[in-house]
Amino acid sequence: MLTKKEQRLRRARQTRIRIATQGVARLTVNRTNLHIYASVISGDGVKVLASASTAEAEVRKALGGSGKGGNVAAAQAIGKRLAEKAKAVGVEKVAFDRAGFAYHGRVKALADAAREAGLQF
């Protein structure tokens, strides 16, 4: 039997394969207990077009500097910031790659904030 982490990584790999056949940029999310990271990667999977995370100094300052990057409010801020950066480089449409994480909580908050800020997926 696969462990919980191995199952998540297998789901993530299968999702990346499906997204690669579409040829659109993908918004990928990684979360840890302390931080959340998001990137927009080109359709061919070679180049990172935009990225944002709660580990960035100016994001931490905007969140109050308390190091609370592992909550829903922080995820919403990252989603909005990432959408703005992606639109600045000309990316409007992406495929959402949640990397095997459940679409719930911080992952959902990030996705909803990115949609509200103008990304389509």
From Swiss-Prot:
UniProt-recorded name of the protein: Large ribosomal subunit protein uL18
GO cellular component annotations of the record: cytosolic large ribosomal subunit
Gene3D superfamilies (UniProt xref): 3.30.420.100
Superkingdom classification of source: Bacteria
Organism: Albidiferax ferrireducens (strain ATCC BAA-621 / DSM 15236 / T118) (Rhodoferax ferrireducens)
A GO MF term: structural constituent of ribosome
Signal peptide: none
Record has Ribonucleoprotein as a keyword: yes
Presence of keyword Secreted: no
Record's subunit section: Part of the 50S ribosomal subunit; part of the 5S rRNA/L5/L18/L25 subcomplex. Contacts the 5S and 23S rRNAs.
PANTHER family in the cross-refs: 39S RIBOSOMAL PROTEIN L18, MITOCHONDRIAL, LARGE RIBOSOMAL SUBUNIT PROTEIN UL18M
Keywords: Ribonucleoprotein, Ribosomal protein, RNA-binding, rRNA-binding
Family listed: Belongs to the universal ribosomal protein uL18 family.
Gene of this entry: rplR
InterPro entries referenced in this protein's UniProt entry, alphabetically: Ribosomal_uL18_bac-type (IPR004389), Ribosomal_uL18_bac/euk (IPR005484)
Biological process terms in GO annotation: translation
